[in-house]
């Protein structure tokens, strides 16, 4: 799944515009990166990010790839 697909899924789940959905996604990624930098990132943090955005847990793969980049 790519960034545009993630934004579209968030937009649908949150009933918001594309810009707002992108902001939500970036905020979650920032939070996950902070946890990663402190060596405190756990798998359930990725699931929580999905849940917070109204996404299915299969979107964890996107976050893993984004954090690895």
Question: What does each model-identified segment do?
Answer:
Residues 7-13, 32, 46-50:
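Leucine-/aliphatic-rich long alpha-helical segments
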Residues 36-68:
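Short, charged early-sequence alpha-helical segments and their helix-coil boundaries
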Residues 1-27:
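N-terminal acidic leader/helix
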């Amino acid at each position: 799944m790519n960034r545009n697909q993630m934004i579209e899924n968030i937009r649908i789940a949150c009933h918001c515009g594309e810009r707002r959905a992108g902001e939500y996604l970036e905020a979650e990624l920032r939070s996950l990166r902070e946890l990663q930098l402190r060596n405190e990132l756990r798998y359930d943090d990725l699931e929580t990010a999905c849940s917070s955005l109204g996404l299915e847990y299969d979107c964890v793969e996107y976050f893993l790839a984004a954090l690895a980049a």
